[in-house]
Amino acid sequence: MNFGKVIQVIGPVVDIQFPPGQLPEIYNAIKIRSADQENYQGSFEIDITLEAAQHLGNNAVRCVAMSSTDGLMRGMKALDTGAPISVPVGAEILGRMFNVLGDPIDEAGQVAAKEVWPIHRKAPTFENLEPSTEVLETGIKVIDLLAPYAKGGKVGLFGGAGVGKTVLIQELINNIAMEYSGYSVFAGVGERTREGNDLYNEFKESGILKNVAMVFGQMNEPPGARMRVALSGLVMAEYFRDVQNQDVLLFIDNIFRFTQAGSEVSALLGRMPSAVGYQPTLSTEMGQLQERITSTKNGSITSVQAIYVPADDLTDPAPATAFAHLDATTVLSRAIAELGIYPAVDPLDSTSRILDPHVVGDEHYSVARGVQKILQRYKELQDIIAILGMDELSEDDKIVVARARKIQRFLSQPFHVAEAFTGTPGKFVPLKESIRGFKEILEGKHDDLPESAFYMVGTIEEAVAKAKEMA
């Protein structure tokens, strides 16, 4: 038993001194429990897990706490467990909800997992990687057409506060996880507890909870938990990929909070802050997480990550660092949300690696580029319209504007998960239908219909039917 003693507590960071030659390794889990203390007089029980982060010299280590450090005192005994934080993995974790340490938090008893894995692991080697070019159909028109997702790829949903990231990730869970019979892992990183609770209950009601493992480290938890909970969720997904050779879905909401937690402890660990006050190790930390979320020859991890954009600034170091790791980026725009168009995806800012004629086919590619071309032209004409009005445009430009406004509205779509709020039933639009609908608008087949007929419908037939009702 390797015991040390607490010599300093600074919020979530604790310094512990060990006997000479018995320093715990970096990333080892260290436990402080009231049961280990001699004549402990505190009013409540203490059971805190910390992670060794730095060796300070003088036989001391600086650790980051995974739960609140309330009640800690100098001189308390701390036990080096001799291993990193480890969480349960395998089929037994499905249908359950965990915290960062892998302890169940759904009040459904202990988890009888046969194996536990450490949360820190190496990324797969280069020769084991398996690039993918198969399109993952989401049933959301704007995504499938303009920034399609790859099976086994990494997707980022970027957006400021309140533009619909969480609703979009819930719709993707609804459309992909419900259609798809495999396993999913959901990691709630530093987001609202209420949303996690709602999601758990939705999974329960819809009957897909038996195929989902959930891990939460929410907003109210100390930065240590928020910094490591993404790794706890990831290791559960890695087990399904590497040992069971499954194709797994990994949902993370929100990657920005992972970076934010790192920056909260960075200064306490004595590092010099870098740009905008972030930790100097920002890109390393992001890389260590993202490089593990990948598809190998054994199985794949398809990941969807919501990424908060502080003050709507995509050049902020946190979202900017995440961009480099993704196969597809879906950018949510406040300007589009203000028009009442949901999902508020920016069709000109969102990108995908697989929007390529060799992957999606010539028809899909030409329709997608045609839609973007018209929307781009409309964007350029907006200044002229604002100053001189529509009448000053040429006949061709008037047609472009009319079609662009129809396309803009046709990119909106009612969601299943928002049905309770909007009263409109959600729509799943197959990719073929999306391509056909936009192709018809581009060809001018629906120039006679009012633009409001295209708002919040599924397929093009619904828009035509809506126009007839309005007439």
Swiss-Prot record:
Provide the function of this protein: Produces ATP from ADP in the presence of a proton gradient across the membrane. The catalytic sites are hosted primarily by the beta subunits.
Which residues lie in coiled coils?
A: none
Looking up CDD domains in the UniProt record yields: ATP-synt_F1_beta_C, ATP-synt_F1_beta_N, F1-ATPase_beta_CD
Group of enzyme by EC: translocase
* Taxonomic placement: Bacteria, Bacillati, Bacillota, Clostridia, Eubacteriales
Q: Where does ATP bind?
A: G159, G160, A161, G162, V163, G164, K165, T166
Where does this polypeptide localize?
Cell membrane
Its UniProt entry gives the catalysed reaction(s) as: ATP + H2O + 4 H(+)(in) = ADP + phosphate + 5 H(+)(out)
EC numbers listed for it are 7.1.2.2
Member of which family?
A: Belongs to the ATPase alpha/beta chains family.
Would the keyword Ion transport turn up in this protein's UniProt record?
A: yes
Q: How does the UniProt record describe the way this protein sits in the membrane?
A: Peripheral membrane protein
What is the protein name for this chain?
ATP synthase subunit beta
Query: In Gene Ontology terms, what is one molecular function of this protein?
Result: ATP hydrolysis activity
Q: Fetch the SUPFAM superfamilies from UniProt.
A: C-terminal domain of alpha and beta subunits of F1 ATP synthase (SSF47917), N-terminal domain of alpha and beta subunits of F1 ATP synthase (SSF50615), P-loop containing nucleoside triphosphate hydrolases (SSF52540)
NCBIfam families annotated for this entry? atpD
Q: Which UniProt keywords apply?
A: ATP synthesis, ATP-binding, Cell membrane, CF(1), Hydrogen ion transport, Ion transport, Membrane, Nucleotide-binding, Translocase, Transport
Supply the source organism for this entry.
Heliobacterium modesticaldum (strain ATCC 51547 / Ice1)
Q: Which Gene3D superfamilies match?
A: 2.40.10.170, Bovine Mitochondrial F1-atpase, Atp Synthase Beta Chain, Chain D, domain 3, P-loop containing nucleotide triphosphate hydrolases
Write down the Pfam families for this protein, in alphabetical order: ATP-synt_ab, ATP-synt_ab_N, ATP-synt_VA_C
